[in-house]
Amino acid sequence: MSISSLELQIQTLPDNPGVYQYYDKDGKILYVGKAKNLKKRVSSYFNKVHDTAKTNVLVKKIVTIKHIVVPTETDALLLENNLIKTLQPRYNILLRDDKTYPWICIKKEPFSRLFPTRKMVKDGSEYFGPYTSFKTVSVILDLIKELYPLRSCNFDLSQKNIENYKFKVCLEYHIGNCKGACEGLETLENYQTQINAIREILKGNFKDSMKDFKKVMTNLAQNMHFEEAQKIKEKIEILENYQSRSTIINPKITNIDVFSIVSDEAAAFINFLQISHGSIIRSHTLEIKKKLDETDQELLELAIVELRERFQLLSREIIVPFEVEVGENIKVTVPQLGDKKQILELSVRNAKFYRIEQLKQLQIVDPERHVNRIMAQMKKDLRLSVEPRHIECFDNSNIQGTNPVAACVVFKDGKPSKKDYRHFNIKTVEGPNDFASMEEVVYRRYKRLLDENQPLPNLIIIDGGKGQLSSALKIIDELDLRGKIAIIGIAKRLEELFYPGDSIPLYLDKKSETLKIIQQLRNEAHRFGITFHRDKRSKAALNSSIETIPGIGEKTMLTLIKHFKSVKRLKLAKEKEISDLIGISKAKKITDFYSKLDN
């Protein structure tokens, strides 16, 4: 793969958190890294000469860049750690040990203990995390202990042992950190109530507990214990930023494969995540070109079989967005809520980003092919006889019947051609009449193009639905252009398109590029028209205001209108700025006039 191909991969990376992976020409993993912004981080490797020889050698070997997009920077850190341990990249020397991030464990036992750990034991205990720093773990545990006195001993507090007085209370009991469950001084029911509250805190549901923490802080401050109150305040701030759950590592999800699909008119993009022991260990996205009108279900089933065979996947459960048929021995899960739904959404996110990147790459490498593809798709979607290489869209701007104007925007090859934009002052229509206004501007536009022998558009889009379409069509017939130019109307609901002589609208897929371009056309026509209307109103207001100033003639008035464009800007202008334009005497008249008006 050439350098240009590598640059192309970098240019189309997303500006999102994630993990990037570098591969050499033989497909061997070189390096795994995390990023708050994938594009910026990866670009930094190639934009400078590095201080260390090792990094310079690494950069020279990179041929392929892969990445996984994740929701947060914390998730990126966790995924990086996990992939480094799984893939053992050559250049991640410092992170190739067995270090894992800490968890908080609620031990499955009578009078459950709460403690940090790096190892997970499958004995029914509950684990929360992982956390990216032990400081966060310590703060959470300290705050919990402020509210909930729990035992710290490792005694076997069975009912029998307690009844036989096998244990004695320790110093923790005497200083108030424990309620003496070992001697039966606290009931299991009361202790369990505390554990339930702690469980909610660790899940991130700590609204009620936060009130209690703040109450402790307030009491300390009222009793003049300001240093202790400040420490509690700092801990609360850390807790407020605490992320209770990671999408990347979840002990409840064991060995499962996740498949999702994002498709358009030409292709489908299937993302695959492999989950092993609660962690993502592989991500891959496959593109399948459509031959016929294959459904997403057909394409996803095909991809699942292909990917399971390619990567020799043996998991007995798969997570998918809808039901699929892939064999009797595989459990198919379509999650609606919870952890599995979150991991499916992560897969969908990566499929979407991959599709965007592929389209960007095509646009950079072969812009003509990219345009041809879009034009062919628009021709098919809109049932046109020719590709809509030249589109014009009309919009009326008529607010409260004042200063009626209209706008015509032009797109060529799917892109705005701003030099061809035109706006119109409505000349022949009195009062608010959108239908008559549309007739006027369509007539003026195409009568002029015909008189000047200018090229006509392939498609006219009328913003306003059936009524506006009928008005425009009347003029198209009058100019003998019916059949020479295609014309459609857009209803208020953007996905509804109306055609001449057809009362039933055409509905476009909300994901289609055709609809996106039509939406862009309408938004641009609306923006262009509103801007012109606003400027016209401002000039009218300025004109009206200046006309009332004694000693200011028409020529001076036009000079001021051309320069300031609005009353507000004229009022705020310094006298010197005005005098430089029209002379000291007239400038004084204007500033005195507005000064008296304000007073």
Swiss-Prot record:
Pfam families in the cross-refs: GIY-YIG, HHH_5, UvrC_RNaseH, UvrC_RNaseH_dom
Assembly and interaction partners: Interacts with UvrB in an incision complex.
Location of this chain's protein in the cell: Cytoplasm
Keyword DNA repair applies: yes
Claim: Metal-binding is one of the keywords in the record: no
Function summary: The UvrABC repair system catalyzes the recognition and processing of DNA lesions. UvrC both incises the 5' and 3' sides of the lesion. The N-terminal half is responsible for the 3' incision and the C-terminal half is responsible for the 5' incision.
Residues passing through the membrane, by range: none
Protein family membership: Belongs to the UvrC family.
Family matches, as SMART domains: GIYc
PANTHER family in the record: UVRABC SYSTEM PROTEIN C, UVRC/OXIDOREDUCTASE
Coiled coil: none
Chief place of localization: cytoplasm
UniProt-recorded name of the protein: UvrABC system protein C
Alphabetic keyword roster: Cytoplasm, DNA damage, DNA excision, DNA repair, Excision nuclease, SOS response
Gene Ontology molecular function terms on file: DNA binding; excinuclease ABC activity
Residue intervals of the UVR domain: 207-242
PROSITE patterns in the cross-refs: GIY_YIG (PS50164), UVRC (PS50165)
GO cellular component assignments: cytoplasm; excinuclease repair complex
GO biological process, one term: nucleotide-excision repair
All residue ranges annotated as the GIY-YIG domain in the record: 15-93
CDD domains for this protein: GIY-YIG_UvrC_Cho
